């Protein structure tokens, strides 16, 4: 679940929470995955792998490659914790808004 207006790591940094269903109860899987900085809008797009072990998170407001260049981060679940897999996938230039849409393959 993406909450791109969350303020956990700064105003509008955003975050993502993943939930799993056990019986009739939804429980959070792992920790909150917070955006990097204010106005990243992380969680504006989210894609979960078919087995639930990877999540791609778009942050279209990230400034890693220029103002509003955006980026995507991929996280893997190990035990009950999410950790980043590889480096940030940054947009190419300012105002690219990379990460507006993300999608993982089924494998």
Label every PLM stretch briefly.
Residues 1-107:
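Conserved beta-strand/short-helix segments
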């Amino acid at each position: 679940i993406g909450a791109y207006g969350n303020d956990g790591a700064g105003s509008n940094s955003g975050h993502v929470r993943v939930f799993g269903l056990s019986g009739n109860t939804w429980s959070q899987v792992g920790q909150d995955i917070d955006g990097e900085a204010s106005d990243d809008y992380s969680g504006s797009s989210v894609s979960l792998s078919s087995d639930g072990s990877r999540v791609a998170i778009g942050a279209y407001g990230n400034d890693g490659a220029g103002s509003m260049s955006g980026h995507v981060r991929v996280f893997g679940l190990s035990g009950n914790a999410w950790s980043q897999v590889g480096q940030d996938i940054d947009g190419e230039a300012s105002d690219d808004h990379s990460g507006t849409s993300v999608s993982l393959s089924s494998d």
